[in-house]
């Protein structure tokens, strides 16, 4: 845990990802047939933005990680940047110069996770 805190402390910056609940609610009201889908679609959009920004940071030589300290830090973040209450914190992405290479990870085989139908 101490090592993780050091890595986060020594970062250059942190990208914070939010979901504007007013926008999601507005879409639910405008398109009631799809209202149950908008929260999930919003999270999927956020995930795509997280990946795109991570790749962009890596492309210019930074290392990054995706963290989820919310809801533990939500109120503090809102106060620090004077953010509206309807902005829901999704994730944090600290970034900086990499000091080590990422460790190897084990994944379930791709053929067990992805199916292609023709």
Language model segments and positions:
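Short, well-ordered beta-strand micro-motif
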Residues: 16-17, 94
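C-terminal helix-cap and adjacent tail motif
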Residues: 1-2, 89-118
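Small-aliphatic-rich amphipathic alpha-helix that forms the alpha element of a beta-alpha
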Residues: 15, 21, 28-79
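Short, hinge-like loop/turn segments at secondary-structure boundaries
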Residues: 82-85
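Active-site/binding-pocket entry motifs
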Residues: 21-23, 99
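Short, surface-exposed beta-edge/turn micro-motifs
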Residues: 11-14, 90
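A short pocket-lining beta-strand/turn micro-motif at the edge of beta-sheets
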Residues: 62-64, 87-91
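Short, small-residue-biased leader/transition segments that mark boundaries at the very start
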Residues: 3-8
């Amino acid at each position: 845990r101490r090592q993780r805190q050091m890595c986060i402390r020594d970062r250059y910056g942190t990208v914070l990802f939010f979901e504007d609940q007013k926008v999601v609610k507005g879409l639910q009201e405008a398109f009631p047939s799809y209202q149950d889908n908008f929260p999930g679609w919003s999270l999927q959009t956020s995930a795509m933005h997280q990946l795109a920004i991570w790749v962009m940071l890596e492309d210019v030589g930074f290392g990054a990680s995706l963290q989820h300290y919310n809801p533990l830090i939500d109120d503090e973040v809102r106060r620090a940047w004077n953010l509206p209450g309807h902005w829901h914190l999704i994730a944090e992405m600290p970034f900086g110069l990499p000091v080590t290479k990422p460790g190897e990870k084990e994944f379930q085989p791709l053929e067990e996770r992805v199916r292609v139908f023709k």
